[in-house]
């Protein structure tokens, strides 16, 4: 008994002595942020007061006392002074290559983003651009971005005659804000080989003058896509690098640390691959190749098609476009447009980009190759086609975690939600439409009932479906605060609320700009929330979106954007 007692005492003393061993020092941070509202967007942490980073990753989050234990002699201590820090925004869908070209093109946007609210202003903006643009001087082509017929006083598209009045010698293309139409002057039509005898291509329309033959200058969908790409200037590497850097700077100024290029054409895809190796990307760029055009590109079968970035670039998969835009009245509906476009019958409901057989071919190709697939669908008929084909193809190529993405889903019907859930489709929605085209959708495109349910984020919350929200830049500017404001308020240009049942809380909207699009991209283990081990991708705002009045969200400023611990944007004083 004594032996046992003695042994027990020795064991106890040994345990106590072991407990006195010095604990290892906590790891040292390179940066510590204190005295701020640090919104982690991680449910287990919520909002904290301090964050430490080391080697480009988050070391710890928590109270100031706990985090300051990671302070060393060389640690940089940043006092947020009550400002707000949250994860860098993850772009759910846009077109970096388009933003790059937009940055060096004529700005044809209407107010509040540009000067063009009538045809005369459009013409003058193009004249000014011709006079000042080195791109026009060198390449002899004029590209203007993002006129919006719904906001022009004339409520029509510019014609070839309107653009010929600017110049009959230089080819001019005015791109519609939807990205799905373009207005061409006569010279641009000639260079594109489009004349009175040119038939409409499959999935596209050449609008005609009153004689029914002569092109008016307005090209829709595939007619536009086939004409525009050959007219884009053949930039030198230095020129395109400059444009690309300008585009990246716009995203960084809006707090984005990951950017998408959706439906990347083969030339641009190869250019991105080449330029990334030169280290020009300050943030992560994930490209999705044009499935219908670039499916034979060797890059889709090479090491860049990867969940990991190389020189801040990777190929995430492919994109397929099944219809057009509702604001341009080319989206494919099951019910007619409220007011059909000029020259169309009252029964006009838009049109598909592909037949069901063609769509089946493309989706099968993506699933066969295990390519993550983004599918552009705006009208409910296009969504029907997508869901029906995806259901059939998934029976042959099942995958529980494919994360096929529905891009826009603007006029998704509630009865389609069951298939969205059953197929594990990830919806990437576009609630900025409520501001830019909400009045137009209600009064001209679809009527009140359909318009109130555009980008139906409320249905997603009700059914517990993760989703993301985006800008579709250059369709709209990649304004993070406009994305947030539109998702929370759903106010139109006229100030009306469109679809109150789909208004998001600021917290849900922020998740749809960070952790949920990170999940969409298969990157939620490294991005989208502020937890230890994830990349130190951060944005600092001057005010807290969780406590600001919803209508004031647009006034919040991005002060600093940080990619893996390195500042890539800081707001001017």
Regions found by a protein language model. Name each.
Residues 1-9:
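Bacterial N-terminal signal peptides that target proteins for export
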Residues 16-19:
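C-terminal motif of bacterial Sec signal peptides marking the signal peptidase cleavage site
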Residues 21-35, 39, 43-301, 307, ...:
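Divalent metal-binding segments
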Residues 364-374, 381-404, 408-409, 414, ...:
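His/Asp/Glu-enriched, well-ordered alpha-helical/loop segment
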Residues 564-566, 572:
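Beta-rich accessory regions
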């Amino acid at each position: 008994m004594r032996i046992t007692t003695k042994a027990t005492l020795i064991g106890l003393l040994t345990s106590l002595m072991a407990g006195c061993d010095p604990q290892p020092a906590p790891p040292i941070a390179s940066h510590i942020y204190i005295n701020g509202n640090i919104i982690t967007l991680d449910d287990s942490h919520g909002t904290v007061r301090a964050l430490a980073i080391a080697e480009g990753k988050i070391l710890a989050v928590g109270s100031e006392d706990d985090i300051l234990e990671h302070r060393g002699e060389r640690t940089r201590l940043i006092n947020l002074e009550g400002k707000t820090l949250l994860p860098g925004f993850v772009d759910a869908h846009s077109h970096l290559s388009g933003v790059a070209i937009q940055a060096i093109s004529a700005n044809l946007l209407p107010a509040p983003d540009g000067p063009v609210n009538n045809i005369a202003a459009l013409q003058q903006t193009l004249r000014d651009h011709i006079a000042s643009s080195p791109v026009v001087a060198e390449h002899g082509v004029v590209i203007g971005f993002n006129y919006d017929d719904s906001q022009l006083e004339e409520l029509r598209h510019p014609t070839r005659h309107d653009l010929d009045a600017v110049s009959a010698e230089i080819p001019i293309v005015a791109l519609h804000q939807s990205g799905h139409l373009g207005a061409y002057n006569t010279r641009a039509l000639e260079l594109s080989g489009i004349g009175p005898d040119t038939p409409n291509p499959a999935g596209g329309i050449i609008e005609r003058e009153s004689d029914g033959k002569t092109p008016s200058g307005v090209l829709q969908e595939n007619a536009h896509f086939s004409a525009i790409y050959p007219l884009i200037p053949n930039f030198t590497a230095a020129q395109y690098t400059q444009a690309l850097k300008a585009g990246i700077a716009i995203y960084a100024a809006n707090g984005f640390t990951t950017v998408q290029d959706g439906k990347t054409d083969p030339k641009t895809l190869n250019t991105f691959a080449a330029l990334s190796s030169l280290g020009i990307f300050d943030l992560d760029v994930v490209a999705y190749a044009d499935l219908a055009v670039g499916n034979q590109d060797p890059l889709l079968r090479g090491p860049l098609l990867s969940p990991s970035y190389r020189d801040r670039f990777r190929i995430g998969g492919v994109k397929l476009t099944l219809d057009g835009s509702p604001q341009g009245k080319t989206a494919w509906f099951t019910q007619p447009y409220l007011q059909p476009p000029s020259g169309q019958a009252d029964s006009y409901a838009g049109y598909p980009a592909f037949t069901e057989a063609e769509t089946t071919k493309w989706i099968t190709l993506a699933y066969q190759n295990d390519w993550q697939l983004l599918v552009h669908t705006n009208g409910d008929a296009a969504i029907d086609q997508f869901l029906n084909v995806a259901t059939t193809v998934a029976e042959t190529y099942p995958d529980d975690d494919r994360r096929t993405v529905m891009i826009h889903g603007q006029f998704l019907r509630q009865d389609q939600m069951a298939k969205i859930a059953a197929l594990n489709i990830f919806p990437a929605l576009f609630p900025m439409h409520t501001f830019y085209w909400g009045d137009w959708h209600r009064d001209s495109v679809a009527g009140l009932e359909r318009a109130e349910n555009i980008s139906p984020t409320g249905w997603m919350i009700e059914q517990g479906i993760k989703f993301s929200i985006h800008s579709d830049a250059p369709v709209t500017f990649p304004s993070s605060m406009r994305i947030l404001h539109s998702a929370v308020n759903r106010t139109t240009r006229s100030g009306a609320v469109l679809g109150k049942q789909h208004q998001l809380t600021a917290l849900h909207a922020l998740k749809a700009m960070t952790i949920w699009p990170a999940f969409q991209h298969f990157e939620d283990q490294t991005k989208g929330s502020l937890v230890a081990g994830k990349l130190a991708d951060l944005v600092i705002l001057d005010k807290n979106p969780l406590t600001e009045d919803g209508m004031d969200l647009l006034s919040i400023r991005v002060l600093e954007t940080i990619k893996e611990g390195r500042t890539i944007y800081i707001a001017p004083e």
